[in-house]
């Protein structure tokens, strides 16, 4: 019986996601056993600086990918939105389980909705994507950076001078906390989700055919297709955490991919947004990127990167 070593970050959410996925594999009843190896990433250690200032995408995966390449672990369970657009040579996303709710969750101290928040209220987020879109809707709000795991951020909302914070609905759902804490879900038209938000990425070595065969049982074709379009868009624009960038794709009734893509200025005064429909994930992602580039997306990205230095 083969033992599969599964790499995971140490946070409660990461371990919850990892154990959930292992349970899906165990339910297949195939002759494998599983062991979780906890790995500390750079993103877990640097908590006093905003993500965008310490290198953005890859912060939560590099050390785990190193463990995959050195064969310390066989596979890793990541949040798809933490994945860089390009993976190291020899590694691949071997499986994308069915995506859960991709929306952002708005959590306010007083129970006020986003529209009802008092003028000048303090909004906690560590995401340039969220802050740009929410400032575009409510320029009067003040954004204050907030870092840490879900539980840390919820504690900071209670104890510190934040009026509201924004978290991913998916993480709260996986922890079973969504009904308890969420004031409202932000509609995708108000705040376009991050590329891959709500989805998991199961990363493994390309040459591990045995494991890839096992993972195929849990793969969700719709999630794979829609997330692929989002990631092609991200790759073409070379967008990481340093840039207000968003991309969310769904499948229409006749199986076409509909991708809404967005790039914004840091302060939300400029939001470029395009929706592209097509059947090929790569073509849809590239088309969305090209349309935004024609509108000046590259200049916005350049300005955002300069602003982070």
UniProtKB/Swiss-Prot annotation:
Top-rank taxon, per record: Bacteria
Amino-acid biosynthesis in keyword set: no
Post-translational modification S-(dipyrrolylmethanemethyl)cysteine, affected residues: 241
Pathways per UniProt: Porphyrin-containing compound metabolism; protoporphyrin-IX biosynthesis; coproporphyrinogen-III from 5-aminolevulinate: step 2/4
Keywords from the named record: Porphyrin biosynthesis, Transferase
GO terms for cellular component: cytoplasm
Regions that span the bilayer: none
Known role: Tetrapolymerization of the monopyrrole PBG into the hydroxymethylbilane pre-uroporphyrinogen in several discrete steps.
Miscellaneous comment: The porphobilinogen subunits are added to the dipyrromethane group.
Subunit comment: Monomer.
Protein name: Porphobilinogen deaminase
Designated gene of the protein: hemC
């Amino acid at each position: 019986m083969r033992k599969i070593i599964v790499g995971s970050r140490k946070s409660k959410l990461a371990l919850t996601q990892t154990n959930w996925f292992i349970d899906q594999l165990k339910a297949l009843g195939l002759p494998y056993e599983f062991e979780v190896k906890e790995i500390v990433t750079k993103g877990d250690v640097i908590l006093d600086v905003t993500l965008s200032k310490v290198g953005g995408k890859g912060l939560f995966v590099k050390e785990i990918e190193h463990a995959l390449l050195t064969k310390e672990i066989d596979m890793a369970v990541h949040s798809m939105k933490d994945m860089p657009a390009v993976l190291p040579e020899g590694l691949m996303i071997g499986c994308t389980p069915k995506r859960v709710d991709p929306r952002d969750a708005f959590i306010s101290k007083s129970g006020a909705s986003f529209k009802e928040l008092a003028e000048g209220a303090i909004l906690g987020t560590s995401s340039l994507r969220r802050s740009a879109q929410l400032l575009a809707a409510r320029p009067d709000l003040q954004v204050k950076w907030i870092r840490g795991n879900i539980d840390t951020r919820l504690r900071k909302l209670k104890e510190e001078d934040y009026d509201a914070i924004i978290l991913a609905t998916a993480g709260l759902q996986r922890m079973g906390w969504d009904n308890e804490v969420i004031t409202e879900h932000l509609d995708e038209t108000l705040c376009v989700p991050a590329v891959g938000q709500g989805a998991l990425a199961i990363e493994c070595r390309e040459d591990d055919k045995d494991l890839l065969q096992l993972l195929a049982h849990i793969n969700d074709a719709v999630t794979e297709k829609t997330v692929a379009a989002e990631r092609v868009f991200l790759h073409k624009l070379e967008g990481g955490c340093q840039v207000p960038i968003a991309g969310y794709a769904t499948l229409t009734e006749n199986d076409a991919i509909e991708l809404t893509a967005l790039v914004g200025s840091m302060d939300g005064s400029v939001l470029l947004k395009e929706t592209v429909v097509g059947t090929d994930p790569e073509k849809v992602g590239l088309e969305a990127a090209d349309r935004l580039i024609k509108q000046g997306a590259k200049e916005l990205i350049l300005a955002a990167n300069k602003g982070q230095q």
